[in-house]
């Protein structure tokens, strides 16, 4: 698997929509800027409404466009909820490791996500701002325990230092890719079984490490 910032002229095999959710000021906008453009600004202003950026990567020799959506964490912007989650196949559930309240609000964000998104959405619990370790208010073990209980992936990151951010997104995108391909493989097998003359050897796709998600759903178009 390789990653990059993409070539606008290259053929796109898949488009995966991933949403960033969590309280205001946990670093969602910085996470988006770091992943999409490899940029970081301490002067980043609070998001108004919704915005998204894209980045194209190569996963298992296929070109995948990641469409990353960022939304305001403030309650007054929650009217965008349904449209924001529509079509999302991945989510980064972000809290600030230096602000306990942002972690305590994660169950509410997760409940909202599960109420509006596809039931098989791939979710990464993301503890941001590890560059402020001396101000930590959320023990890593608390987040690990919550992620395990809820069946989520989990990583701690720093948008400022670009620590583990790539890993977090690639884990989510690769898991989505595997789910989509396993669904496609099953569809191919069903088609072959209905037409004995077309039976051929099938390539078995072995999923990468991480959560095995029941019920696969193809969600994106090339």
Curated annotation (Swiss-Prot):
Lipid moiety-binding region (S-geranylgeranyl cysteine): 219-220
MF terms (GO), sorted A to Z: GTP binding; GTPase activity
Binding site for GTP: 22-29, 70-74, 128-131
Bilayer disposition of the protein: Lipid-anchor
InterPro entries: P-loop_NTPase, Rab_GTPases_membrane_traffic, Small_GTP-bd, Small_GTPase
Single GO cellular component term: Golgi apparatus
Compartments, as annotated in UniProt: Cell membrane
SMART domains: ARF (SM00177), RAB (SM00175), RAN (SM00176), RAS (SM00173), RHO (SM00174)
Tagged with keyword Iron-sulfur: no
Domain of life: Eukaryota
Family (UniProt): Belongs to the small GTPase superfamily. Rab family.
Protein name (Swiss-Prot/TrEMBL): Ras-related protein Rab11C
């Amino acid at each position: 698997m390789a990653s990059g910032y993409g070539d606008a002229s290259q053929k796109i095999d898949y488009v995966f929509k991933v949403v960033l959710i969590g309280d205001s000021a946990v670093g969602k906008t910085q996470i988006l800027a770091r992943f999409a453009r490899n940029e970081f600004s301490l002067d980043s202003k609070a998001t108004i409404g919704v915005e998204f950026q894209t980045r194209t990567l190569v996963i298992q020799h296929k070109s995948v466009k990641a469409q990353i959506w960022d939304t305001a964490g403030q309650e007054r912007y929650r009217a965008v909820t349904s449209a924001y989650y529509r079509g999302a196949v991945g989510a980064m559930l972000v809290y600030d490791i230096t602000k306990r309240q942002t972690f305590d609000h994660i169950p509410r964000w997760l409940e909202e996500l599960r109420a509006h998104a596809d039931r098989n959405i791939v979710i990464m619990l993301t503890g941001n701002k590890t560059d402020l370790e001396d101000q930590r208010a959320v023990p890593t073990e608390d987040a690990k325990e919550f992620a395990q209980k809820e069946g989520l992936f989990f990583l701690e990151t720093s948008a400022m230092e670009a620590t583990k951010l790539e890993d977090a997104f690639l884990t989510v995108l690769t898991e989505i890719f595997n789910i989509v391909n396993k669904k496609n493989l099953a569809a191919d097998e069903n088609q072959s079984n209905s037409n004995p003359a077309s039976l051929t050897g099938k390539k078995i796709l072995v999923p990468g490490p991480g959560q095995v998600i029941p019920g696969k759903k193809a969600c994106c178009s090339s």
